């Protein structure tokens, strides 16, 4: 997405919010999406990027949705916005074996980032949460890092992504087996080598020896009980539970307004990070 501009004074930060919406080919009764993004209260530029669109792929309608939460710059997140879905769909077996195609594309995309000699890709990194909806029926969700995917079914929240926390036993063991370590300093979150607060990312060349970009992948069959999908950056999940986000979104049939209200609630709860939310409503 384009960078979101902001004006600053000595006493106040004024940020611009970006929102939009769209729908699948089924029109009024079909699947609709909306998104809302707003820059956080930090001094750096907006580092969250997103994808939200429907496209035709070999006669199938695909909904492509993603949030990429960058750190140490927005370059890796911007690269993912441009390349990750295209790399997934380049695989000739995508419709036959989506899980394998997604996992392979995540790995290959990260390798291309790490091999790139551009200086703007040297130091930064990004989380990713992606969702691919095939013909309105099959939903494939993948993630690395701590951006979340939440499905509401009959008003109940179910997290469909995994937060890759360095202090998780499995993640810590992986890091330590590669020669890294996890710090637990008072007043701070666990960090890889004292630096990074997630254990799986794209990029981060200086820490890659201790990390990986292997995604968690889950599939969901959309049925009459499936209400909507929320994709959210950690600017939301740090201050709201999954059920709280669902409770806000389910009050609004318009997915753009639902996304805006989730963002507004995160701001109300004093979230300081960049905040991004996509809502895909199935019924």
Swiss-Prot record:
Residues engaged in binding Mn(2+) 2: 69, 234, 273
Domain PPM-type phosphatase: 32-282
UniProt catalytic activity: O-phospho-L-seryl-[protein] + H2O = L-seryl-[protein] + phosphate; O-phospho-L-threonyl-[protein] + H2O = L-threonyl-[protein] + phosphate
Annotated EC: 3.1.3.16
GO CC aspect terms: plasma membrane
Residues engaged in binding Mn(2+) 1: 69-70
Co-factor remark: Binds 2 magnesium or manganese ions per subunit.
Gene3D superfamilies referenced in this protein's UniProt entry, alphabetically: PPM-type phosphatase domain (3.60.40.10)
Requisite cofactors: Mg(2+); Mn(2+)
Pfam family, one: PP2C
EC category: hydrolase
InterPro entries listed in its UniProt record: PP2C, PPM-type-like_dom_sf, PPM-type_phosphatase-like_dom
UniProt keyword annotations, A-Z: Hydrolase, Magnesium, Manganese, Metal-binding, Protein phosphatase
Family: Belongs to the PP2C family.
Protein name: Probable protein phosphatase 2C 17
